[in-house]
């Protein structure tokens, strides 16, 4: 061992350590711990950093308190649509609709159609009580042949028109009867509220009181006259009306007599209380009458396709004529 300036130099052979000799590690250093082994298997990204998906060191222990409660599914409610509304709800809604909208509602779906097809349902009873005058409701004979509330309400919309009438006539409080005031040298008429231009329609007409010299029942357009001076068959006096004079059983149109009606020898005269049914067939352009359910034959044919109204004219003072719309008549 040599000394150099007080420093002790150990030869390489004695140290047995050279730059080329690898350093031996202990056996403990060669064994990888589980943590190191696990870390060595971790995948890295391109930059050498552990990926975000590095698993935790130890799995979490699940406890009853750590498990989130399951959400209970609420029972599935049926879908609510207008076509599934209860009948009571529909009746409450339909009460506020006019007739034209009710007709549209009947064409909307089967449910609404079924609700409105019941002619005595609450909706029709409500509308009937709202529209029909008390005098008509309390009369046991006026609408006796109309069984349902819907038919009675429809008859009201086809009754005499208070705004389309001679100045010497007025409509009674029941809405279905016209009264002629005792005015001399005057012929006075009245038209129905609604005109018709298609389909078959029937009107029951009853004359209450003496007929006088002129008592005509028939049809007229909107342009036919409803008043004139003197006692004349006003209905049938021009090309806008067709009339049957119950006094002499003569048909009139355009100021000309078309013959006796019904076409038989010595036809029976009208008697007070007889029910005359006027039937207008707009599809075949004819009109005819029945008396006490007896068919009297075709009265007018080749009627032009115009909007027609039921009409009457009278000359006798204080006479009254009642008209009730019955809808489409029973054929055959």
Curated annotation (Swiss-Prot):
Segments of skewed composition (Polar residues): 15-28, 49-64
A GO-annotated cellular component: neuromuscular junction
B30.2/SPRY domain residues: 138-330
GO terms (BP aspect): dauer larval development; determination of adult lifespan; negative regulation of apoptotic process; negative regulation of axon extension; negative regulation of axon regeneration; negative regulation of DNA damage response, signal transduction by p53 class mediator; negative regulation of gene expression; positive regulation of neuromuscular synaptic transmission
Family annotation (Pfam families): F-box, SPRY
Compartments, record wording: Synapse
Keywords: Synapse, Ubl conjugation pathway
InterPro entries on file: B30.2/SPRY (IPR001870), B30.2/SPRY_sf (IPR043136), ConA-like_dom_sf (IPR013320), F-box-like_dom_sf (IPR036047), F-box_dom (IPR001810), FBXO45-Fsn/SPSB_families (IPR050672), SPRY_dom (IPR003877), SPRY_FBXO45 (IPR035784)
Chief place of localization: other
Chain residue ranges for the region called Disordered: 1-82
Subunit structure: Component of an SCF (SKP1-CUL1-F-box protein) E3 ubiquitin ligase complex composed of cul-1, fsn-1, rpm-1 and skr-1. Interacts (via SPRY domain) with scd-2 (via cytoplasmic domain). Interacts (via SPRY domain) with convertase egl-3 (via C-terminus).
The name this protein goes by in its record: F-box/SPRY domain-containing protein 1
Originating organism: Caenorhabditis elegans
């Amino acid at each position: 061992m040599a000394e150099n300036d007080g420093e002790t130099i150990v030869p390489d052979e004695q140290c047995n350590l050279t730059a080329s000799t690898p350093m031996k590690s202990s056996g403990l250093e060669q064994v990888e711990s589980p943590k190191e082994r696990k870390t060595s298997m971790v995948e890295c990204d391109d930059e050498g950093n552990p990926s975000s998906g590095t698993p935790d060191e130890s799995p979490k222990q699940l406890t009853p308190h750590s498990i989130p409660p399951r959400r209970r599914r609420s029972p599935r409610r049926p879908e609510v649509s207008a076509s599934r509304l209860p009948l009571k709800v529909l009746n409450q809604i339909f009460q506020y609709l006019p007739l034209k909208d009710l007709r549209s509602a009947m064409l909307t779906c089967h449910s609404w159609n079924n609700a409105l097809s019941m002619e005595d349902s609450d909706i029709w009873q409500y509308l009937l009580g709202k529209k029909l005058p008390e005098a008509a409701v309390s009369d046991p004979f006026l609408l006796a042949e109309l069984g349902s509330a819907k038919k009675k309400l429809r008859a009201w919309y086809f009754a005499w028109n208070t705004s389309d009438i001679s100045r010497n006539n007025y409509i009674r409080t029941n809405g279905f009867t016209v009264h002629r005031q005792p005015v001399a040298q005057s012929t006075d008429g009245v038209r129905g509220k609604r005109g018709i231009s298609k389909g078959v329609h029937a009107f029951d007409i009853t004359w209450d009181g003496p007929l006088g010299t002129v008592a005509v029942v028939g049809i007229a357009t909107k342009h036919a006259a409803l008043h004139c001076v003197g006692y004349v068959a006003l209905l049938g006096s021009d090309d806008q009306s067709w009339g049957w004079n119950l006094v002499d059983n003569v048909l009139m149109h355009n100021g000309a007599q078309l013959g006796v009606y019904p076409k038989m020898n010595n036809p029976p005269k009208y008697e007070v209380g007889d029910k005359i049914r006027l039937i207008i067939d707009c599809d075949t352009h004819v009109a005819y009458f029945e008396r006490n359910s007896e068919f009297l034959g075709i009265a007018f044919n080749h009627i032009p396709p115009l909007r027609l109204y039921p009409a009457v004219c009278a000359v006798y003072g204080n006479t009254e004529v009642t008209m009730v719309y019955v809808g489409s008549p029973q054929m055959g």
